[in-house]
Amino acid sequence: MELTEQQMFDYIYCPALYDFKYNKNVVLEKPKKISDLVNQVCNYFFMYIIEFKKIPSLAMLSNKYEKLYLKDKELFDDSKYTSGLFLLRNFYNWACQEKLTPFSSNMPFALTIDDIEIYGYTNPIVINKNSKTFEFLFLKYNNRLLDTNDLDKKLKFSLDCLAFNQNPNYKINVIKVKNIRNNKEYITSRNNNDYKRIKSTIKNISNGIKNKVFYPSEGIKCKDCPYKYYCKAWN
């Protein structure tokens, strides 16, 4: 079986949602947030440094952000534009102060677990300026406090590390989480127990899809789900 990481996380979110998107081809666009635009510009920042070996100016990033914003302007009010600029400046100032050295931005990966092929893209990888070791960087943009318990268990981090660590020459077990809005930071790591958990999760998802287990996950997220009017749980 072949799965993208998006399919995997959609199934975890709600098996019924997976069924609508990938079996019944009911594809609904997820509402775009201003943080999505900021994140695109941050990835551009990483790619620019990797390609040109120098830091782009804040004006370059602001121009990139403005072009993205104008393309989807009807989706946002004017206050969101200002909010995005604030986040972008925060990121730029922090990255320059940290002398952030990116190794990759959204590196593609293919991971084999038994007869299951998982395809996806990792979070950006940066080089720690003190230890000179690799670590994943996960940027957050909301105003909420970092949920350390959630971050310590986050499956995406385990998946990234497991996929990257297939390379015998490099190892990453550390993930730096940076909240750009409130400047909070948290370091988490992964070990063999985390890798066993993500492998087991992938196998369970594969079995669920093969056996057509597409029940709705009724819960607090249902009210904001774009598929709620299609879902039998709401009929």
Regions found by a protein language model. Give the residues of each.
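Short helix-capping/linker segments at secondary-structure and domain boundaries
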Residues: V26-V27, F46-K54, C96-E98, N165-K171, ...
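Hydrophobic (often cysteine-bearing) scaffold residues that line and stabilize catalytic clefts
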Residues: I34, V38, K80, G84, ...
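Short, intrinsically disordered, charge-biased short linear motifs at domain edges
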Residues: M1-T4, N204-I220
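Cysteine-cluster motifs in flexible loop/terminal segments that predominantly coordinate metals
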Residues: I12-D19, N211-N235
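A residue-level signal for conserved active-site and pocket-lining positions in enzyme catalytic cores
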Residues: C14, V38, C42, P124, ...
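Nuclease catalytic cores
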Residues: Q6-E51, G84, N106
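Mg2+/Mn2+-dependent nuclease catalytic core
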Residues: F103-T201
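A non-catalytic, helix-rich entry segment at domain boundaries
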Residues: Q40-M107
